[in-house]
């Protein structure tokens, strides 16, 4: 895949992510915060962006969404065969929410030090 195609794909993913984020925020802000892994201030800012601002933000050359599955053990656990799919989804939610809480605590502690 050429570099131009990669950048085009990144821009499309970014815009899709931002549009999805706005839709999630409209439906339920607390659920959006959990699913997106961002704080309320960020949700408020994203919800107020116009389409032209979303397009501009989506056109940066880096992915704006973060892969929250950044631990090999977590990935292995979540991709393992499960006899009960619903249980696997609950387990995934627990793993991601725990990771989100750790992230927020770390950010809060960092902000207090400044």
UniProtKB/Swiss-Prot annotation:
One of its GO terms (cellular component) is cytoplasm. GO terms for biological process: bacterial-type flagellum assembly; positive regulation of DNA-templated transcription; regulation of bacterial-type flagellum assembly. The keyword DNA-binding applies. GO terms for molecular function: DNA binding. InterPro entries: Flagellar_FlhD, FlhD_sf. It comes from the Bacteria. Keywords: Activator, Bacterial flagellum biogenesis, Cytoplasm, Disulfide bond, DNA-binding, Transcription, Transcription regulation. Pfam families: FlhD. It is found in: Cytoplasm. The keyword DNA-binding applies. Functions in complex with FlhC as a master transcriptional regulator that regulates transcription of several flagellar and non-flagellar operons by binding to their promoter region. Activates expression of class 2 flagellar genes, including fliA, which is a flagellum-specific sigma factor that turns on the class 3 genes. Also regulates genes whose products function in a variety of physiological pathways. The C-terminal region contains a putative helix-turn-helix (HTH) motif, suggesting that this region may bind DNA. Belongs to the FlhD family. Homodimer; disulfide-linked. Forms a heterohexamer composed of two FlhC and four FlhD subunits. Each FlhC binds a FlhD dimer, forming a heterotrimer, and a hexamer assembles by dimerization of two heterotrimers. NCBIfam families: PRK02909.1-1. This is Flagellar transcriptional regulator FlhD. It comes from Wigglesworthia glossinidia brevipalpis. The lineage of its organism: Bacteria, Pseudomonadati, Pseudomonadota, Gammaproteobacteria, Enterobacterales.
């Amino acid at each position: 895949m050429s570099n131009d195609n990669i950048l085009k794909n990144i821009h499309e993913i970014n815009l899709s992510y931002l549009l999805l984020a706005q839709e999630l925020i409209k439906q339920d802000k607390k659920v959006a915060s959990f699913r997106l892994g961002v704080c309320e201030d960020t949700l408020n800012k994203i919800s107020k962006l116009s389409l032209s601002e979303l397009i501009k933000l989506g056109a940066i050359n880096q992915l704006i969404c973060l892969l929250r599955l950044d631990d090999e053990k977590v990935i292995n656990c979540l991709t393992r065969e499960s006899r009960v799919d619903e249980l696997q989804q609950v387990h995934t939610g627990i793993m991601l929410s725990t990771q989100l809480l750790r992230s927020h605590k770390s950010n809060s502690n960092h902000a207090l030090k400044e």
